[in-house]
């Protein structure tokens, strides 16, 4: 089990993030493609990222754009997202040697992705999700996505990991289970997200516990719903979640949103047995 940090908005540059990662004794940074400085054209300048990481003896994972929507009904949009994934996989292949040098070679390099809920139509008595209404079309998009990713990843030690956010829809669970039929896909458990929605994703996640390889670790509460808190500032049974991550040999991102909360979380782990 290794711990890393997210891309933090307070840090304006890659070097700012790396300096913080090194100071806190963390192993990796999860590069967030929602930030302008980590857009695909920037990430493709891999020599810059590799040189900076080697100087600090760290490596990277990648968080795909949260807006990623490979099932968009507009083929121009879905094809752009597919091309984004293809090129990001090529970036990850070039970053893999950093994992080999400074990480754990038993842990695949991960590209973290969210499930895009799609749009819904509000009727007088209910909301109808378009992906639920046109489920066959939705699943055809995921079949194409899975086939493409298997081809693009090839034999590289890279996994695309699906993260829980604000509650998986039933149609999303079916799509995720379809993806998990492929060895190139696994799961991320964001323990703060699940706490903030009353743990309703936990039964689904635990039914696929053998596919858990990545965790987003932060504290949270149910009432009021909060997440991305420093460890110890919420209601989560952190030891239970950390023990599961350890048993799964999972990589863990301390996904707070501020430097202060990240520092506090590292201190919390240092005081806990066997984590950092």
Where are these regions (language model features)?
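Glycine-rich, proline-tolerant flexible connector loops at the mouths of alpha/beta enzymes
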Residues: 30-50
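Short glycine/serine/threonine/alanine-rich loop segments
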Residues: 26, 58, 158, 185, ...
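Active-site acidic/histidine proton-transfer and metal-coordination neighborhood
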Residues: 54-55, 70-186
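Active-site beta-loop-alpha junctions enriched in small/polar residues
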Residues: 6-10, 32-36, 65-67, 116-118, ...
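N-terminal small/glycine-rich loop or linker at the start of catalytic domains
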Residues: 1-4, 65-68, 123-125
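Histidine-acidic metal/acid-base catalytic patches
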Residues: 2, 11, 15-22, 71-73, ...
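Alpha-helix-loop-beta-strand connector modules within alpha/beta enzyme cores
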Residues: 47-65, 142-152, 238-244
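Generic enzyme active-site microenvironment
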Residues: 28, 61-63, 161-163, 188, ...
